[in-house]
Regions:
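NAD(P)-dependent Rossmann-like dehydrogenase/reductase catalytic/cofactor-binding core
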Residues: 200, 204-258
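Aromatic-residue-lined binding/catalytic grooves and analogous aromatic/hydrophobic interfacial grooves
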Residues: 170
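NAD(P)+-binding Rossmann beta1-loop-alpha1 motif at the extreme N-terminus of oxidoreductases
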Residues: 1-58, 126-127, 186-187
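Rossmann-like NAD(P)(H) cofactor-binding subdomain of soluble oxidoreductases
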Residues: 16, 36-39, 46, 50, ...
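Internal alpha-helical scaffold of NAD(P)-dependent oxidoreductase catalytic cores
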Residues: 45, 102-112, 128-163, 174-212, ...
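Small-residue helix-packing motif on alpha-helices
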Residues: 39, 72, 191-199, 220
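A short acidic, helix-capping loop that chelates divalent metal ions and anchors anionic groups
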Residues: 123-127, 162-164, 233
Length: 258
């Protein structure tokens, strides 16, 4: 039976562990983090086993690296001898900015690498996961064990910075929008609970409209704005404040790491 190991149990590593368990309720999960005693609750939730890193490296067929990008090289340096003795592993990396070429240099030639870029919505099965690398067999394995995370999208590696900025950083921008909308609702007389619930539903519904009708967002916007009405007055204020440009600049800045 295939065994999966996860190294790094921060927010992303934990979310991926949960997604894997939801995708397959029998696959053995080996978990590792620097301080093993800090993830007992997660291990129990996903029916995984907290183990030392050397055991994980030796026993796992698929190894998911969920550590920070600046820790990748030092990890492989620290465990060089063990890793060089391993055969035929499939590695998954969520380290932003660390290329497939760089990753492949860290392991024996018979190992395969797939780069992943998930967003945090995988925690509830509504995420978006871009991936590149591997062959058709390894990609089918990825589909099998991450199907509960949301949508998996193959993209070329050169598109990773743009994807990261839009889909990886994007949820933070939407949270700001939801917060601002709910603040406005409270100012207008709604309770905080009402305002937040309404704002969330508006964002969810608008996204679904674009996706399901396949109409351009501008056409859908025009369908809401009537001549001289309240909506077009609000749109004028958004344009006056430069919202459209601010969103574009935020995503471009994220894609360039600035």
């Amino acid at each position: 039976m295939t065994c999966i190991g996860i190294i790094g149990l921060g927010q992303m590593g934990s979310a991926l562990a949960k997604a894997i368990r939801k995708s397959d309720d029998t696959v053995p999960l080996l978990l590792n983090r620097r301080h093993l005693n800090q993830s007992q609750a997660l291990a129990q939730e996903v029916q995984g086993e907290l183990v030392p890193v050397n055991r994980l490296l030796q026993e796992a067929d698929i190894i998911l690296m969920a550590i920070k990008p600046n820790q990748v090289r030092s990890f492989f340096k620290d465990h060089y001898k063990t890793i060089q003795s391993l055969q035929g592993k499939l590695w998954l990396s969520v380290a932003a900015g660390v290329s497939l070429t760089e990753l492949q240099e860290l392991t024996p030639s018979d190992h395969q690498w797939i780069r992943l870029m998930p967003n945090t919505s995988i925690e509830i099965g509504k995420g978006l996961v871009a991936y590149t690398g591997g062959d058709s067999t390894s990609q089918s394995i990825l589909d099998k064990y991450l199907k509960a995370s949301g949508s998996l999208v193959p993209i070329s590696e050169d598109k990773f910075p743009a994807f990261t900025a839009l889909a990886g950083c994007g949820p933070a921008y939407i949270y700001i929008l939801i917060e601002a909308m709910s603040d406005a609702g409270v100012h207008a007389g709604l309770s905080r609970q009402e305002a937040l619930a309404f704002a969330c539903q508006v964002v969810e519904g608008a996204g679904a409209m674009v996706k399901e009708t396949r109409q351009h967002p501008a056409l859908l916007k025009d369908g809401v704005t009537s001549p001289g009405g309240a909506t077009i007055q609000g749109v004028r204020k958004l344009e006056e404040a430069g919202l459209r440009s601010a969103i574009i600049e935020a995503i471009l800045a994220s894609s360039q790491g600035k």
